[in-house]
Amino acid sequence: MARVLEYLKNTQFGIPYGVNCLNVDAMGFELAIQYDCAFLQLDSVVGHVKPRDEPTLDAFFRLYRSRCQAFVMGGVRFKYQPVLSEHTVEEDLQIATTRCDGVCVTQDKTGQETSLEKIITFRRTLGDFPLFVCAGVTPENIASQLQYADGAVVGSYFKQGHKDSGDLCPEYVQQLMDAVQLARNSH
């Protein structure tokens, strides 16, 4: 991963790039700092640790946010993350706004469509705070999702068989981007 980030930094394509180290948040922050990433995605910023550990997690985010200039995208009730919070989802979303620059929403697993109901709940709670759909985005659902979300992170849809282990398929990228353009033009 470091080799790719070093290449992107040194080549200076003029396009934003970022990093996601899944559940290794410190490594994500360190790579984002070292390679001048424009953004950093974290699987969870609240609710995934025991309540007694929330103050430590908050201190972790305050420390790294003071050192890192990247736009931090943080998951709340994110796929594969335990929900150990004693708070409502609405309360955790409010906490998230102090730990990241944009909230990521997913359903339960990679490639599974994120329900419009969950996206709407997050949007209503977050108001104008940036919201990104980060699982299950397809050409068929992107228009309805972008009515509520500010953007999307797409992985498995772009790959052969729409599986996260597949190779990148340019045709799938084009299909989704055509649907995004159509959705943008209709608003």
What are the roles of these predicted feature ranges?
Residues 99, 106, 128-129, 148:
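Structured helix-beta-strand junction loops
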Residues 8-16, 64-70, 99, 178-187:
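A structural motif corresponding to the C-terminal end of an alpha-helix
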Residues 10-21, 67-81, 121-135:
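Short beta-strand/loop segments at the ligand-binding rim of alpha/beta enzyme cores
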Residues 1-10, 23-30, 46-68, 107-126, ...:
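Active-site-adjacent beta->alpha loops and helix N-cap segments on the catalytic face
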Residues 24-37, 87-94, 124-125, 131-155:
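Catalytic cores of alpha/beta
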Residues 152-187:
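C-terminal appended segment following the main domain
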Residues 24-104:
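Conserved anion-binding
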